[in-house]
């Protein structure tokens, strides 16, 4: 019984256990199913999210690729346009070169035609000369002389016709200038102050009656004065004042002193003019010497040869591009000395070289060569050292500097010249033209003096009367005018006047 109860109990327990176990298994299965469904949903959601992100990334990548493609397209378009522009420019250059080649070919063709014409002209001329020589062989001396005279007359007539044309054109130009005078008044008002300090001097008179005495009977006094001094004496309506005009300051100053002495003395006639002129020349020499001594005193340069001091004084009356050469030399000496002092170099030698660096300008209108070459020769002649000579030669680069002081002098020269307002180009060009005119006239044989006057519109040439007759004087005037025309550029018409004067002097005792 007990065994049966135990068996029943066991069976019941087994049944209950089975039921409970089955229930638990079913519960676990349901939970597993729920978990599987949940995981499946979660996986689906994650898959959707991954898909969405992949789509977004794909779209971004596509957009980025599109942008890169657009940028590449723009770059290629830009390169294409640049290439097209370069091609167009090359085409333009090629086109211009073709035009230039065409023009050169045309010019060459014209030149060839001109050469052919010149060749034919030469052949014709040779033929004419052969005929003339054949003809002259059977002529007398008088007949040949007459032919030469006729040809010379024809040549002069041709030159006169050209001169007439130039004079006419000059008058038309002057008329046009006068028409513009009102417009240019403001500019012209500055001209006397700008140029007056260099090219003109005024002399005050006690009264206007003195003007008549200065002119003299039939103008003999004024003619004598201008001939002796080489300066224009301008007498106009300005009350109690006459004007002296010359580009050469030394001549002008001597003329001023001469005229002041004549006015003070009151006796004005040719002999008195010559006497006062000689006195004024002596006075001028004294002024030149004093100016040179003052320059050496201001700069502290000692031991200069007396002739060098005299040449320094002459620089007071010379200008370079409107700058006073003596003032410029003093300025260069002081600037160079200051720089030498800062660098611990030889101050005295530098100052001496700076003062003498333009000494050649005192004679460059009288001696052939550049002012540096002339200055070096002068310094050598009067015992200056090789260093000083090198400073003179090297300040314009004509010789290499051999010492640092030479470099300082060149630098100081450039500083002084480059200072605002120190120099003027147009005046120097004008003066060089006048000096060149005088040199051309002086290059002819038997010429005593030559003066460029009337602002460079006239050259007066004084010849030796014993060696030149009237016919030769006419010929010389023509030849000088021709040479100036060929070698000098000048506005308007230039007049050449050759003066031949013979004086006979006797004394009654």
From Swiss-Prot:
Residues 325-418 form the HD domain. Residues 199-259 form the KH domain. One of its GO terms (biological process) is mRNA catabolic process. GO terms for molecular function: RNA binding; RNA endonuclease activity. Keywords: Cell membrane, Endonuclease, Hydrolase, Membrane, Nuclease, RNA-binding, Transmembrane, Transmembrane helix. Endoribonuclease that initiates mRNA decay. This is Ribonuclease Y. It comes from Pseudothermotoga lettingae (strain ATCC BAA-301 / DSM 14385 / NBRC 107922 / TMO). The gene is rny.
């Amino acid at each position: 019984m007990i065994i049966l109860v135990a068996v029943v109990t066991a069976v019941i327990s087994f049944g209950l256990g089975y039921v409970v176990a089955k229930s638990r298994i079913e519960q676990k299965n349901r939970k597993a199913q729920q978990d599987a469904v949940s995981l499946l949903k979660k996986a689906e959601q994650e898959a959707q999210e991954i898909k969405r992100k992949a789509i977004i990334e794909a779209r971004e990548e596509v957009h980025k690729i599109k942008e890169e493609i657009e940028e590449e397209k723009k770059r290629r378009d830009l390169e294409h346009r640049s290439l097209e522009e370069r091609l167009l420019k090359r085409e333009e250059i090629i086109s211009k070169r073709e035009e230039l080649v065409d023009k050169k070919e045309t010019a060459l063709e014209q030149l060839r035609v001109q050469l052919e014409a010149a060749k034919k002209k030469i052949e014709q001329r040779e033929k004419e000369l052969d005929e003339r020589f054949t003809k002259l062989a059977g002529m007398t001396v008088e007949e040949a002389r007459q032919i030469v005279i006729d040809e010379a007359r024809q040549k002069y007539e041709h030159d006169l016709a050209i001169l007439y044309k130039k004079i006419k054109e000059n008058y038309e130009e002057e008329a046009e200038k006068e028409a513009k005078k009102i417009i240019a008044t403001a500019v012209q008002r500055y001209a006397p102050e700008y140029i007056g300090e260099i090219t003109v001097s005024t002399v005050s008179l006690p009264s206007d009656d003195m003007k008549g005495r200065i002119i003299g009977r039939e103008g003999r006094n004024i003619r004598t004065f201008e001939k002796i001094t080489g300066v224009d004496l301008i007498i106009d309506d300005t009350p109690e004042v006459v004007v002296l005009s010359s580009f050469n300051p030394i001549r002008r100053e001597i003329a001023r002193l001469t005229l002041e002495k004549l006015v003070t003395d009151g006796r004005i006639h040719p002999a008195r003019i010559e006497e006062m002129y000689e006195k004024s020349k002596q006075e001028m020499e004294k002024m030149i010497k004093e100016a040179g001594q003052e320059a050496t005193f201001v700069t502290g340069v000692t031991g200069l040869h007396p002739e060098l001091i005299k040449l320094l004084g002459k620089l007071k009356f010379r200008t370079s591009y409107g700058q006073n050469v003596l003032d410029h030399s003093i300025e260069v000496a002081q600037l160079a000395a200051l720089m030498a002092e800062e660098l611990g170099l030889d101050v005295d030698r530098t100052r001496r070289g700076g003062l003498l660096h333009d000494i050649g300008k005192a004679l460059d209108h009288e001696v052939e060569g550049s002012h540096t070459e002339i200055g070096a020769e002068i310094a050598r002649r009067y015992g200056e050292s090789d260093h000083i000579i090198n400073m003179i030669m090297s300040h314009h680069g004509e010789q290499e500097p051999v010492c640092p002081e030479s470099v300082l002098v060149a630098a100081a020269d450039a500083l002084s010249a480059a200072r605002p307002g120190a120099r003027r180009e147009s005046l120097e060009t004008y003066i060089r033209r006048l000096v060149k005119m005088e040199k051309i006239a002086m290059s002819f044989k038997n010429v005593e003096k030559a003066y460029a006057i009337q602002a460079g519109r006239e050259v007066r040439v004084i010849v030796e009367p014993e060696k030149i007759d009237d016919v030769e004087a006419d010929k010389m005037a023509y030849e000088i005018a021709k040479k100036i025309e060929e070698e000098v550029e000048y506005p308007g018409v230039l007049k050449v006047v050759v003066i031949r004067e013979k004086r006979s002097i006797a004394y009654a005792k």
